[in-house]
Amino acid sequence: MIARIWSGESPLWRLLLPLSWLYGLVSGAIRLSYKLGFKRAWRAPVPVVVVGNLTAGGNGKTPVVIWLVEKLQQRGVRVGVVSRGYGGKAAAYPLLLTPETTTAEAGDEPVLIYQRTGAPVAVAPERAAAVKAILAAHNVQIIITDDGLQHYRLARDIEIVVIDGVRRFGNGWWLPAGPMRERASRLKTVDAAIVNGGVARAGEIPMQLAPGLAVNLRTGARCDVAQLSNIVAMAGIGHPPRFFATLEACGAHPQKCVPLADHQTLAPADVQALVGEGQTLVMTEKDAVKCCAFAEDNWWFLPVDARLSGEQPDKLLEHITSLVR
Protein backbone atom coordinates (compact mmCIF):
# COMPACT_ATOMS: atom_id res chain seq x y z
CA MET A 1 0.00 0.00 0.00
CA ILE A 2 2.78 2.45 0.93
CA ALA A 3 4.52 1.78 -2.40
CA ARG A 4 1.31 2.57 -4.31
CA ILE A 5 0.74 5.75 -2.31
CA TRP A 6 4.30 6.99 -2.77
CA SER A 7 4.34 6.17 -6.48
CA GLY A 8 1.14 8.15 -7.00
CA GLU A 9 -0.87 5.11 -8.13
CA SER A 10 -3.19 5.44 -5.14
CA PRO A 11 -5.01 8.77 -4.59
CA LEU A 12 -4.71 8.31 -0.81
CA TRP A 13 -1.51 10.39 -0.80
CA ARG A 14 -3.67 13.51 -1.00
CA LEU A 15 -5.13 12.75 2.44
CA LEU A 16 -1.63 12.87 3.91
CA LEU A 17 -0.63 16.22 2.40
CA PRO A 18 -1.17 18.26 5.60
CA LEU A 19 1.32 16.03 7.43
CA SER A 20 3.73 16.27 4.51
CA TRP A 21 3.64 20.06 4.57
CA LEU A 22 4.38 19.95 8.29
CA TYR A 23 7.27 17.54 7.71
CA GLY A 24 8.68 19.74 4.95
CA LEU A 25 8.35 22.86 7.08
CA VAL A 26 10.14 21.33 10.06
CA SER A 27 12.92 19.65 8.05
CA GLY A 28 13.49 22.79 6.01
CA ALA A 29 13.69 24.91 9.15
CA ILE A 30 16.26 22.56 10.67
CA ARG A 31 18.50 22.70 7.60
CA LEU A 32 18.14 26.48 7.35
CA SER A 33 19.07 26.92 11.01
CA TYR A 34 22.43 25.25 10.35
CA LYS A 35 22.94 27.05 7.05
CA LEU A 36 22.39 30.47 8.66
CA GLY A 37 24.51 29.63 11.70
CA PHE A 38 21.77 29.62 14.32
CA LYS A 39 22.86 26.06 15.10
CA ARG A 40 26.43 24.85 14.86
CA ALA A 41 27.49 21.50 13.46
CA TRP A 42 30.39 19.61 15.00
CA ARG A 43 33.33 19.27 12.61
CA ALA A 44 35.62 16.26 12.89
CA PRO A 45 39.40 16.70 12.60
CA VAL A 46 39.35 14.37 9.57
CA PRO A 47 37.25 14.60 6.38
CA VAL A 48 33.69 13.26 6.58
CA VAL A 49 31.86 11.73 3.62
CA VAL A 50 28.10 11.24 3.92
CA VAL A 51 26.41 8.56 1.80
CA GLY A 52 22.67 9.05 2.08
CA ASN A 53 19.27 9.26 0.44
CA LEU A 54 16.69 11.88 -0.38
CA THR A 55 13.96 9.25 -0.06
CA ALA A 56 12.87 6.66 2.47
CA GLY A 57 13.20 3.02 1.48
CA GLY A 58 16.06 0.96 0.09
CA ASN A 59 18.08 2.60 -2.65
CA GLY A 60 21.28 0.54 -2.53
CA LYS A 61 23.13 2.80 -0.11
CA THR A 62 24.96 0.09 1.85
CA PRO A 63 26.61 -1.47 -1.24
CA VAL A 64 27.81 2.03 -2.17
CA VAL A 65 29.32 2.49 1.30
CA ILE A 66 31.11 -0.87 0.99
CA TRP A 67 32.33 0.04 -2.52
CA LEU A 68 33.65 3.38 -1.30
CA VAL A 69 35.41 1.90 1.73
CA GLU A 70 37.07 -0.81 -0.34
CA LYS A 71 38.18 1.59 -3.08
CA LEU A 72 39.72 3.97 -0.54
CA GLN A 73 41.42 1.08 1.27
CA GLN A 74 42.94 0.01 -2.05
CA ARG A 75 44.41 3.50 -2.31
CA GLY A 76 45.99 3.12 1.11
CA VAL A 77 43.50 5.31 2.96
CA ARG A 78 42.58 4.35 6.52
CA VAL A 79 38.78 4.52 6.68
CA GLY A 80 36.30 4.50 9.55
CA VAL A 81 32.53 4.11 9.22
CA VAL A 82 29.78 5.48 11.46
CA SER A 83 26.08 4.67 11.47
CA ARG A 84 22.93 5.30 13.44
CA GLY A 85 22.60 1.54 13.88
CA TYR A 86 18.94 1.17 12.89
CA GLY A 87 17.41 -2.05 14.18
CA GLY A 88 19.96 -2.49 16.96
CA LYS A 89 19.90 -1.57 20.64
CA ALA A 90 23.20 -1.48 22.48
CA ALA A 91 23.63 -1.38 26.24
CA ALA A 92 25.59 1.86 25.82
CA TYR A 93 26.55 4.25 23.04
CA PRO A 94 28.76 4.86 21.19
CA LEU A 95 29.38 1.21 20.33
CA LEU A 96 32.58 0.17 18.55
CA LEU A 97 31.99 -3.05 16.65
CA THR A 98 34.05 -6.16 17.32
CA PRO A 99 33.87 -9.65 15.76
CA GLU A 100 31.49 -10.58 18.60
CA THR A 101 29.06 -7.68 18.08
CA THR A 102 25.58 -8.87 17.10
CA THR A 103 23.00 -7.30 14.83
CA ALA A 104 20.72 -7.01 17.88
CA GLU A 105 23.27 -4.58 19.32
CA ALA A 106 24.49 -2.68 16.27
CA GLY A 107 21.91 -3.26 13.54
CA ASP A 108 22.32 -5.32 10.39
CA GLU A 109 23.96 -2.77 8.07
CA PRO A 110 26.86 -1.83 10.39
CA VAL A 111 27.63 -5.51 11.04
CA LEU A 112 27.54 -6.23 7.30
CA ILE A 113 29.87 -3.30 6.53
CA TYR A 114 32.24 -4.39 9.31
CA GLN A 115 32.36 -7.98 8.11
CA ARG A 116 32.80 -7.08 4.45
CA THR A 117 35.45 -4.37 4.80
CA GLY A 118 37.23 -4.92 8.11
CA ALA A 119 37.12 -1.14 8.63
CA PRO A 120 36.48 0.26 12.11
CA VAL A 121 32.73 0.81 12.55
CA ALA A 122 30.93 2.65 15.34
CA VAL A 123 27.22 3.24 15.92
CA ALA A 124 25.41 5.86 17.98
CA PRO A 125 22.19 7.88 17.70
CA GLU A 126 24.43 10.97 17.77
CA ARG A 127 26.85 10.40 14.90
CA ALA A 128 29.41 12.85 16.26
CA ALA A 129 29.79 10.57 19.29
CA ALA A 130 30.42 7.62 16.98
CA VAL A 131 33.08 9.60 15.09
CA LYS A 132 34.82 10.55 18.34
CA ALA A 133 34.82 6.90 19.46
CA ILE A 134 36.51 5.77 16.25
CA LEU A 135 39.08 8.57 16.37
CA ALA A 136 39.93 7.69 19.98
CA ALA A 137 40.50 4.02 19.16
CA HIS A 138 41.81 4.02 15.58
CA ASN A 139 44.20 6.11 13.51
CA VAL A 140 41.77 6.70 10.64
CA GLN A 141 42.22 9.35 7.96
CA ILE A 142 38.63 9.71 6.82
CA ILE A 143 35.13 8.95 8.10
CA ILE A 144 32.27 7.63 5.98
CA THR A 145 28.82 7.95 7.47
CA ASP A 146 26.29 5.35 6.38
CA ASP A 147 23.14 7.43 5.93
CA GLY A 148 22.78 10.72 7.78
CA LEU A 149 22.36 13.16 4.90
CA GLN A 150 19.74 14.94 7.02
CA HIS A 151 21.83 14.67 10.23
CA TYR A 152 23.12 18.22 10.05
CA ARG A 153 24.63 18.16 13.53
CA LEU A 154 27.64 16.49 11.92
CA ALA A 155 29.54 18.69 9.46
CA ARG A 156 30.54 17.00 6.24
CA ASP A 157 33.05 17.58 3.44
CA ILE A 158 31.46 15.41 0.76
CA GLU A 159 27.81 14.48 0.21
CA ILE A 160 26.84 11.50 -1.94
CA VAL A 161 23.20 10.70 -2.67
CA VAL A 162 22.05 7.26 -3.84
CA ILE A 163 18.90 7.19 -5.99
CA ASP A 164 16.74 4.25 -7.01
CA GLY A 165 16.82 4.58 -10.80
CA VAL A 166 13.44 2.92 -11.28
CA ARG A 167 11.39 4.55 -8.53
CA ARG A 168 13.35 7.83 -8.51
CA PHE A 169 11.38 10.21 -6.25
CA GLY A 170 7.92 8.67 -6.56
CA ASN A 171 5.19 11.30 -6.44
CA GLY A 172 7.73 13.88 -5.27
CA TRP A 173 6.08 14.68 -1.94
CA TRP A 174 7.60 14.77 1.51
CA LEU A 175 6.87 12.01 4.01
CA PRO A 176 4.31 10.61 4.68
CA ALA A 177 2.37 11.44 1.48
CA GLY A 178 5.45 10.63 -0.56
CA PRO A 179 8.93 9.16 -0.06
CA MET A 180 10.89 12.42 0.10
CA ARG A 181 13.00 13.36 3.11
CA GLU A 182 14.05 16.50 1.27
CA ARG A 183 13.11 18.12 -2.01
CA ALA A 184 14.68 16.81 -5.23
CA SER A 185 16.26 20.25 -5.66
CA ARG A 186 18.68 19.21 -2.88
CA LEU A 187 20.57 17.32 -5.60
CA LYS A 188 21.96 20.65 -6.79
CA THR A 189 23.99 20.98 -3.59
CA VAL A 190 25.48 17.47 -3.29
CA ASP A 191 28.84 16.38 -4.65
CA ALA A 192 27.65 13.22 -6.42
CA ALA A 193 24.41 11.44 -7.27
CA ILE A 194 24.66 7.69 -7.85
CA VAL A 195 21.74 6.03 -9.63
CA ASN A 196 21.07 2.38 -8.83
CA GLY A 197 19.53 0.75 -11.92
CA GLY A 198 17.26 2.44 -14.40
CA VAL A 199 18.67 5.21 -16.58
CA ALA A 200 21.01 7.79 -15.10
CA ARG A 201 20.41 11.39 -16.10
CA ALA A 202 22.98 14.02 -17.02
CA GLY A 203 25.59 14.40 -14.29
CA GLU A 204 24.52 11.26 -12.42
CA ILE A 205 26.76 8.22 -11.93
CA PRO A 206 25.22 4.96 -13.23
CA MET A 207 25.38 1.97 -10.90
CA GLN A 208 24.27 -1.63 -11.05
CA LEU A 209 24.16 -4.21 -8.27
CA ALA A 210 26.16 -7.19 -9.50
CA PRO A 211 25.30 -10.51 -7.81
CA GLY A 212 28.06 -12.93 -6.92
CA LEU A 213 27.92 -16.65 -6.17
CA ALA A 214 25.40 -17.83 -3.60
CA VAL A 215 27.02 -18.60 -0.23
CA ASN A 216 25.87 -21.27 2.22
CA LEU A 217 25.34 -19.80 5.68
CA ARG A 218 26.54 -22.93 7.48
CA THR A 219 29.50 -24.10 5.40
CA GLY A 220 30.57 -21.10 3.33
CA ALA A 221 30.27 -23.22 0.18
CA ARG A 222 29.58 -21.26 -3.01
CA CYS A 223 27.62 -22.01 -6.14
CA ASP A 224 25.70 -20.37 -8.93
CA VAL A 225 22.33 -19.46 -7.44
CA ALA A 226 20.61 -20.88 -10.54
CA GLN A 227 21.85 -24.33 -9.50
CA LEU A 228 19.76 -24.23 -6.34
CA SER A 229 16.32 -25.83 -6.55
CA ASN A 230 12.91 -25.25 -4.97
CA ILE A 231 13.89 -21.78 -3.79
CA VAL A 232 12.06 -19.75 -1.17
CA ALA A 233 13.35 -16.17 -1.38
CA MET A 234 13.42 -13.92 1.68
CA ALA A 235 14.32 -10.24 1.73
CA GLY A 236 14.23 -7.91 4.73
CA ILE A 237 15.52 -4.80 2.96
CA GLY A 238 14.12 -1.42 2.01
CA HIS A 239 12.82 -2.61 -1.37
CA PRO A 240 12.45 -6.44 -1.44
CA PRO A 241 11.20 -6.63 -5.08
CA ARG A 242 14.68 -5.61 -6.24
CA PHE A 243 16.18 -8.73 -4.66
CA PHE A 244 13.51 -11.00 -6.09
CA ALA A 245 14.07 -9.50 -9.55
CA THR A 246 17.81 -10.10 -9.17
CA LEU A 247 17.18 -13.78 -8.49
CA GLU A 248 14.99 -14.05 -11.58
CA ALA A 249 17.67 -12.33 -13.67
CA CYS A 250 20.21 -14.87 -12.40
CA GLY A 251 18.04 -17.75 -13.60
CA ALA A 252 16.83 -18.68 -10.13
CA HIS A 253 13.03 -18.76 -10.10
CA PRO A 254 11.70 -18.77 -6.52
CA GLN A 255 8.64 -20.84 -5.71
CA LYS A 256 7.75 -18.26 -3.08
CA CYS A 257 8.94 -14.73 -2.30
CA VAL A 258 8.73 -13.45 1.27
CA PRO A 259 9.17 -9.68 1.69
CA LEU A 260 10.01 -8.52 5.20
CA ALA A 261 10.35 -5.09 6.76
CA ASP A 262 13.73 -3.40 6.62
CA HIS A 263 15.77 -4.06 9.80
CA GLN A 264 13.12 -6.55 10.98
CA THR A 265 14.14 -8.77 13.88
CA LEU A 266 14.22 -12.38 12.72
CA ALA A 267 13.26 -15.12 15.18
CA PRO A 268 14.72 -18.57 14.39
CA ALA A 269 11.34 -20.31 14.44
CA ASP A 270 9.81 -17.76 12.06
CA VAL A 271 12.57 -18.15 9.50
CA GLN A 272 12.62 -21.93 9.80
CA ALA A 273 8.86 -22.02 9.18
CA LEU A 274 9.33 -20.41 5.77
CA VAL A 275 11.05 -23.47 4.33
CA GLY A 276 9.39 -26.82 3.77
CA GLU A 277 10.98 -30.20 3.15
CA GLY A 278 13.10 -30.21 0.01
CA GLN A 279 13.11 -26.43 -0.28
CA THR A 280 16.06 -24.05 -0.23
CA LEU A 281 16.04 -20.66 1.47
CA VAL A 282 17.85 -17.84 -0.33
CA MET A 283 18.16 -14.47 1.41
CA THR A 284 20.02 -11.19 1.12
CA GLU A 285 23.43 -10.78 2.69
CA LYS A 286 21.90 -8.23 5.05
CA ASP A 287 19.48 -10.90 6.30
CA ALA A 288 22.29 -13.44 6.50
CA VAL A 289 24.19 -11.50 9.15
CA LYS A 290 21.08 -11.83 11.35
CA CYS A 291 20.52 -15.53 10.60
CA CYS A 292 24.02 -17.02 10.63
CA ALA A 293 23.82 -17.99 14.32
CA PHE A 294 20.85 -20.31 13.76
CA ALA A 295 21.19 -21.18 10.07
CA GLU A 296 20.17 -24.53 8.62
CA ASP A 297 22.12 -26.52 6.02
CA ASN A 298 19.83 -25.42 3.18
CA TRP A 299 20.09 -21.67 3.80
CA TRP A 300 22.00 -19.51 1.33
CA PHE A 301 22.53 -15.83 0.70
CA LEU A 302 23.26 -13.93 -2.50
CA PRO A 303 25.85 -11.17 -2.10
CA VAL A 304 25.75 -8.14 -4.37
CA ASP A 305 28.43 -5.58 -5.17
CA ALA A 306 28.04 -2.05 -6.45
CA ARG A 307 29.39 -1.56 -9.97
CA LEU A 308 29.78 2.10 -10.91
CA SER A 309 30.48 2.92 -14.55
CA GLY A 310 32.00 5.79 -16.49
CA GLU A 311 34.82 8.18 -15.60
CA GLN A 312 32.99 9.91 -12.76
CA PRO A 313 33.66 7.27 -10.06
CA ASP A 314 37.44 7.67 -10.45
CA LYS A 315 37.11 11.45 -10.35
CA LEU A 316 35.00 11.18 -7.21
CA LEU A 317 37.58 8.92 -5.57
CA GLU A 318 40.39 11.28 -6.55
CA HIS A 319 38.50 14.20 -5.06
CA ILE A 320 37.86 12.35 -1.80
CA THR A 321 41.46 11.12 -1.58
CA SER A 322 42.75 14.66 -2.10
CA LEU A 323 41.08 15.70 1.16
CA VAL A 324 43.13 13.21 3.19
CA ARG A 325 46.10 14.78 4.93
UniProtKB/Swiss-Prot annotation:
Membrane-spanning ranges: none
Keywords for the protein's UniProt record, in alphabetical order: ATP-binding, Kinase, Lipid A biosynthesis, Lipid biosynthesis, Lipid metabolism, Nucleotide-binding, Transferase
Signal peptide boundaries: none
InterPro entries per the UniProt record, alphabetical: LpxK, P-loop_NTPase
EC number of the protein: 2.7.1.130
Pathway: Glycolipid biosynthesis; lipid IV(A) biosynthesis; lipid IV(A) from (3R)-3-hydroxytetradecanoyl-[acyl-carrier-protein] and UDP-N-acetyl-alpha-D-glucosamine: step 6/6
Stored Pfam families: LpxK
GO biological process terms, semicolon-separated: lipid A biosynthetic process; lipopolysaccharide core region biosynthetic process
Top class in the EC scheme: transferase
GO MF terms held by the record: ATP binding; tetraacyldisaccharide 4'-kinase activity
Reactions it catalyzes: a lipid A disaccharide + ATP = a lipid IVA + ADP + H(+)
Binding site for ATP: T55, A56, G57, G58, N59, G60, K61, T62
A Gene Ontology cellular-component term: plasma membrane
General function of this protein: Transfers the gamma-phosphate of ATP to the 4'-position of a tetraacyldisaccharide 1-phosphate intermediate (termed DS-1-P) to form tetraacyldisaccharide 1,4'-bis-phosphate (lipid IVA).
HAMAP family documented for this protein: LpxK
UniProt family annotation: Belongs to the LpxK family.
PANTHER family: TETRAACYLDISACCHARIDE 4'-KINASE (PTHR42724), TETRAACYLDISACCHARIDE 4'-KINASE, MITOCHONDRIAL-RELATED (PTHR42724:SF1)
Protein name: Tetraacyldisaccharide 4'-kinase
Organism of provenance: Salmonella newport (strain SL254)
Gene name as annotated: lpxK
